[in-house]
Amino acid sequence: MDFRAALEQLKAALQRPLPGAGAHRLTAPRPPRQWPAGFDQANIRHAAGLLLLFPVDDRAHIVLTVRADTLGRHGGQVSLPGGVVEPGETFEAAALREAQEEIGIASGPVRIVGALTPIDIPVSAFRLHPIVGAIDERPVMRPSDDEVAAILEVPVDRLLDPASLIETERLRIRHRFGLRSE
């Protein structure tokens, strides 16, 4: 998809009401994860991620990261560059700061286009606020070795192609334990 056309289409879509949880269900794990019984939602931690739109050979792309395996519960997962919102920080500022920390993108040339519906992540008690940004040229990206295993540049037309959306079942068993020496 042409970068300028994708950007205009996205701007127009962000002027309408967002589809919210219905859109999330299309790609959510089955069964969808819920907040644990008795969980006090006042304890939700807020995070922000940058959904950055940029051109590669005039085709619209977004950037995703593969998180370093050393990063707790979400290590090895594909994600938006992003992280915890610091006290007094806006979601937009947090998304830009985290993108700079994780993939080395300077925030100056990034234009904030809007925000998508927040996504709850019960396993780690986070609510992720996706912030949409755009930049007019392919950014130079350098992954933070501590946080990012790989940077993925994903063509938007692949994401919009129904043939790219496949349903799979995946089982991942992960257990950490420590060893003591005497």
Features from the language model and the residues they span:
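Acidic, glycine-rich loop-and-strand cores that form catalytic or ligand-binding grooves
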Residues: 141-167
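N-terminal leader/linker segments that precede catalytic domains of diphosphate-processing enzymes
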Residues: 1-79, 84-101, 105-139, 148, ...
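Acidic, negatively charged sequence signal
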Residues: 165-176
